[in-house]
């Protein structure tokens, strides 16, 4: 009779050893509570995915959000991050600072949340694969999570039939050389991604 009572605390302790602890440190302009809840709910799905591949048990994410792009660019200059003059992306992940930085929320709440999911995915990939993960994998996973929504059934990707057809057509017409694409460096990959 005592054995089950003695084993129960051991079972709980072992469960805690396996628990994933992810802390998000918010900085910059304040986010509404609803956005924080959405981010934390979404991140739980990302963490469950990346845990399968060796994501550390305890992890701190730094998320720096700016409402205004101009303030974000000034901040980047102050921390010695220099972007090209015509840089159009709405967010970056800085491996040097280990921080996701959102460069303005002018495009609205839904779009900025998608960018946050994208940039935090870069952090997870680097935690697993180190400083130089393959560009196609790093960007591919980030793009995947950027285009997902949380539903009652879990995470659902918003990949449209048009996008599926376009990729299939590009491959069938030989517009994509998958071997070269997989082996391309960051610069070449990013150039191809823009097309």
Give the residues covered by each predicted segment.
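Short intrinsically disordered, low-complexity coil segments enriched in acidic
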Residues: 13, 119, 193-194
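Juxtacatalytic substrate-recognition/specificity segment
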Residues: 20-134
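Residue-level marker of positions within ordered structural domains that often coincide
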Residues: 14, 68, 147
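Alpha-helix boundary/capping residues
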Residues: 11, 79, 148-149
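Sec/Tat signal peptide C-region and signal peptidase I cleavage site
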Residues: 15-19
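Sec-dependent N-terminal signal peptides
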Residues: 4-14
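Acidic/His/Gly-enriched intrinsically disordered linker/tail segments
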Residues: 84-94, 100, 129-195
């Amino acid at each position: 009779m005592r054995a089950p009572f003695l084993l129960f605390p051991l079972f709980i302790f072992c469960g805690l050893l396996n628990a994933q602890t992810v802390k998000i440190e918010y900085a910059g302009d304040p986010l509404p509570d609803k956005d924080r809840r959405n981010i934390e709910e979404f991140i739980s799905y990302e963490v469950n995915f990346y845990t399968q591949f060796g994501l550390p048990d305890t992890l701190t994410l730094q998320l720096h959000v700016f409402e205004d792009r101009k303030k974000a660019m000034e901040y980047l200059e102050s921390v010695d991050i220099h972007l090209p003059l015509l840089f159009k992306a709405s967010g970056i992940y800085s491996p040097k600072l280990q921080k996701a930085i959102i460069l303005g929320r002018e495009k609205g709440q839904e779009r900025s949340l998608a960018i946050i999911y994208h940039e935090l995915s870069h952090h997870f990939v680097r935690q697993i694969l180190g400083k130089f993960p393959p560009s196609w994998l790093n960007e591919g996973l980030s793009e995947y999570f950027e285009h997902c929504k949380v539903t009652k059934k879990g995470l659902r990707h918003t990949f449209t039939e048009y996008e599926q057809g376009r990729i299939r057509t590009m491959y069938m017409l030989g517009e994509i050389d998958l071997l070269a694409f997989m082996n391309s460096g960051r610069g070449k990959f990013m150039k191809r991604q823009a097309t």
